Amino acid sequence: MPELPEVQTTVNGLNSTVKGRKIVSIWNDYDSPYFRNKDEIKNPKFYAKFKKLVIGQKILKAERRAKNILIHLGNKHTILIHMKMTGHLLYEGYKKDPFNSHIHLYFQFDNGKHLYFSDMRKFAKITLIETGKLKHSIHLSHLGPEPLDKNFQFKIFNFQLHKRPKGKIKQVLMDQTLIAGIGNIYSDEILWRAGVHPTSQVNKIPEKNFKEMFKAMKEVLKKGIDFGGDSMSDYRNIKGEKGRFQEHHRAYQRKGKICDKKGCKGVIQRIIVATRSAHFCPTHQKLFK
């Protein structure tokens, strides 16, 4: 699933291509009986309302909240897209790739260009909300603070994670109600850098290591954005291109490989933590319990 860096990369791409453009038509082939009573475009009745409110509107800008893409329109409504497992947006003339061929939605603009949505497993969530009600909507109201905000300092980081004092740190880092945007990939990389075992109990981890985690979190997420996201799986940017963060993994999906930490001779292992995989070095990542 795309995490904070992949979603931010997509938002940056939207602002460089479709910001200021007017939507002139929409097409989609989502239609699921499981969404008949939901406010998503997979519900044909909601899609009819969606089209009516979106066509003819100018895109003011795109933003990110956690793993959600927010496309603000001129009529004070916002298109919310959660890409889920396999979704990604593609702008006109994108690079051809098998992962870019599962088109289930597109927007056409006043310049004749299109914005496509590829979603191989059709899990994505796409809806429309009044912009003024976004913050308190069921989609965003539960989310924790943004880890890259300037105001998100160590004190807040420490406080948020200690809301789950007996939780395993890998699981707690991925809890979207505590900190928004961190998932499987980046939690592994954060813990590798901080030297903390993924099953360490939160309230047993020394403050020194929490400070290392905080520093690692800022560095890893920024690095993820700098490298255009992670395309170990099927994520692509709006040009249809792969990100490059997967070339810089130190833990995630490196099972059986020698640890890259200087002076460490550990071998990366993989375990399951609360149904999610965790990759770590058993030599330099300390277990606190």
Question: Where are the language model's segments positioned?
Answer:
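Catalytic cores of large soluble enzymes that bind and process phosphate-bearing ligands
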Residues: 2, 6, 149, 209
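Acidic, proline/glycine-enriched N-terminal capping motif
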Residues: 1-136, 278, 282, 286-289
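Short histidine-centered catalytic/ligand-binding loop motif
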Residues: 96, 139-148, 200-207
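A short, charged helix-loop
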Residues: 124-164
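Basic, nucleic-acid-binding surfaces and adjacent catalytic neighborhoods in DNA/RNA-processing proteins
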Residues: 22-50, 58, 63, 159-289
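Hydrophobic, well-ordered secondary-structure segments
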Residues: 102-104, 114, 137-140, 170, ...
